[in-house]
Amino acid sequence: MADLFGGGHGGELMEALQPFYKSASTSASNPAFASSNDAFASAPNDLFSSSSYYNPHASLFPSHSTTSYPDIYSGSMTYPSSFGSDLQQPENYQSQFHYQNTITYTHQDNNTCMLNFIEPSQPGFMTQPGPSSGSVSKPAKLYRGVRQRHWGKWVAEIRLPRNRTRLWLGTFDTAEEAALAYDRAAFKLRGDSARLNFPALRYQTGSSPSDTGEYGPIQAAVDAKLEAILAEPKNQPGKTERTSRKRAKAAASSAEQPSAPQQHSGSGESDGSGSPTSDVMVQEMCQEPEMPWNENFMLGKCPSYEIDWASILS
């Protein structure tokens, strides 16, 4: 190193760099900056061995020492140097440590701000595992006769006990309103046997739920339908037709039953189960008249070509 600066080439290099050293020393008004320039002048090859800007990762390389100069954060600027630690001062270490901490905290704050600017709708957003606060949560409790539309409204319906059809009760903003409307309609149709969503509201007066409650009265059209259903007779047209058919079949069978015994009575007379006079007449007609026994007559009545009955009888 001495040969490099002490030789002929070293002298020429020092002479060439002398104007730059003078301009730097005259422009610096701070005494700390002037002392740093003296240290920088004592190491002329520092311009060739390292860059002239601050390297935030200079602390990762222990083989290089650092020289601090004033900056906007702590009043000093750090330049890497390849010389020993004889140029280091305690205040330079403190300023360098403060500057590195400032850079680290600033980087973390910038990352936090960037994460806050990213919205969940953007494609680069990564969802965290676990329950999210922005997701729409389903209701914890489902009510009888209540269902939700896809746009968020709630609908109440009740199944009629006779023809098993659904009666629409209305559209509501909340599930509780729809459940209460179902309870009113169910109590009107089924009375005390109705299964309600709010059994605790059954009902201090012993009648149907109060229509002047928190959620307002039932719609007039729905109430009219319920009254019409209650006013209908219990037997529906389909059931009356079935009962009339059954009655007609029973009457036809009862009309056919008396004619059957008459036919059996006629057949009974022919079988001999009738009156005694008829039995006697039948027996007389069936019996043949008795003829007196006569051997000659009998033998002559039955001639034979093999036997000469005339010679036998003579």
Curated annotation (Swiss-Prot):
Residues 142-199 bind DNA. This is Ethylene-responsive transcription factor ERF055. One of its GO terms (molecular function) is transcription cis-regulatory region binding. Residues 231-288 are annotated as: Disordered. It comes from the Eukaryota. The lineage of its organism: Eukaryota, Viridiplantae, Streptophyta, Embryophyta, Tracheophyta. It is found in: Nucleus. One of its GO terms (cellular component) is nucleus. It comes from Arabidopsis thaliana. Keywords: Activator, DNA-binding, Ethylene signaling pathway, Nucleus, Transcription, Transcription regulation. The gene is ERF055. Belongs to the AP2/ERF transcription factor family. ERF subfamily. Pfam families: AP2 (PF00847). Gene3D superfamilies: AP2/ERF domain. Its main location: nucleus. Residues 250-278 have a biased composition (Low complexity). The keyword Nucleus applies. GO terms for biological process: ethylene-activated signaling pathway; regulation of DNA-templated transcription; response to water. Probably acts as a transcriptional activator. Binds to the GCC-box pathogenesis-related promoter element. May be involved in the regulation of gene expression by stress factors and by components of stress signal transduction pathways. The keyword Nucleus applies. InterPro entries: AP2/ERF_dom, AP2/ERF_dom_sf, DNA-bd_dom_sf, ERF/AP2-like.
